[in-house]
């Protein structure tokens, strides 16, 4: 079986000898699926089988979860014999092997995100680790760390029928500061019991280093996905959790957003990726890292230049948290009509 994914005209061909993994990836990247392609830029091959034996090599890096080897353009990421990724930068191919279905899907999912992140940046489009929603022509991005409450906030915002989704945790920003949707999936610690999201079909996502999550593909909410690119009116929020007390959404000068932007966009903490694919140890790769950092910085600057900025001190009242965001979105939208 095979699957074509089109990310801003970078085509990734995904093939697998296991149908279940490909079905899950199709649902994850549903909005980027196309039936055929005349040319392919990257190939990802997924094998549910015993990883092949490694050739004689010296490890260039050891981590808690894997050993990394390199021969010429090929990089081998050995997950303690349980899984193996072979990335050939010259041929633009990634081969992933494992007998463990959950491990196979997790590595494949992260590998595709890693590839598209770098390729999008070559086109001047960057990811930001944030919840993205829209109201009319007003886009709102809420930057929060992993497990900070982005999906929980979305479950309450989406109860308003005028709210549309840009992304659960990874909208895109171009070099003009415009926001592009990246609708993949919603991830929750537990399945919602009420509201629009409770009616979705949820799947268990078992992760190696992190607790299990429940995910639902946004293809089930096609009428709630934002299809326009937005940029004229933007609210940019840096969120902080409170142990107790009432939530506060307060405007701040743009310079106060520099550190949150560095964390959530320029460094990209929390963005899905196989970091081992990009651990490099030569001068050429260091220059590439500087290049990608520069692209992210330009996108971030243009986004910040357009945005009205807020700090959001979030208390335990989730409905009130959502209402504060909604009130600000309506105020901006109505003031610009």
Which positions does each model-derived feature cover?
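A noncatalytic interaction/capping subdomain that flanks phosphate/NTP-handling catalytic cores
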Residues: 1-146, 159-164, 172-337
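Conserved lysine of the Walker
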Residues: 150
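Post-Walker A alpha-helix
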Residues: 153-154
């Amino acid at each position: 079986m095979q699957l074509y994914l089109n990310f801003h005209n970078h085509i990734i061909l995904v093939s697998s000898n296991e149908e279940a993994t490909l079905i899950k990836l199709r649902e994850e990247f549903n909005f980027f699926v196309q039936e055929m392609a005349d040319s392919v830029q990257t190939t990802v091959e997924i094998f549910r089988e015993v990883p092949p034996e490694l050739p004689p090599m010296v490890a260039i890096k050891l981590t808690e979860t894997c050993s990394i080897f390199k021969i010429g353009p090929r990089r081998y990421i050995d997950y303690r014999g349980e899984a193996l990724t072979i990335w050939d930068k010259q041929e633009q191919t990634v081969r992933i092997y494992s007998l463990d279905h959950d491990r196979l899907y997790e590595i494949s999912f992260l590998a595709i995100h890693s590839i598209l992140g770098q390729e999008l940046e070559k086109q001047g489009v960057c990811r930001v680790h944030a919840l993205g929603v829209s109201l009319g022509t007003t886009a709102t991005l809420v930057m929060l760390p992993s497990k900070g409450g982005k999906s929980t906030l979305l479950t309450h915002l989406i109860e308003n029928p005028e709210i549309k989704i840009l992304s659960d945790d990874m909208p895109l920003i171009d070099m003009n500061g415009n926001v592009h949707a990246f609708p993949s999936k919603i991830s929750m610690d537990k399945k919602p019991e009420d509201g629009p999201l409770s009616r979705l079909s949820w799947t268990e996502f078992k992760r190696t280093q992190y607790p299990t999550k429940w995910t639902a593909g946004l293809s089930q909410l096609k009428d709630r996905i934002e299809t326009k690119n937005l940029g004229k009116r933007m609210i940019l929020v840096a969120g902080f959790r409170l142990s107790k007390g009432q939530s506060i959404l307060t405007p701040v000068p743009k310079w106060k957003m520099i550190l949150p932007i560095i964390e959530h966009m320029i460094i990209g903490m929390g963005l899905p990726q196989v970091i081992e694919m990009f651990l490099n140890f030569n001068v050429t790769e260091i220059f590439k890292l500087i290049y990608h950092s520069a692209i992210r910085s330009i996108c971030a600057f243009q986004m910040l230049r357009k945005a009205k900025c807020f700090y959001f001190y979030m208390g335990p009242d989730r409905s009130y948290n959502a209402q504060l965001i909604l009130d600000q979105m309506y105020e901006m939208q109505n003031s610009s009509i």
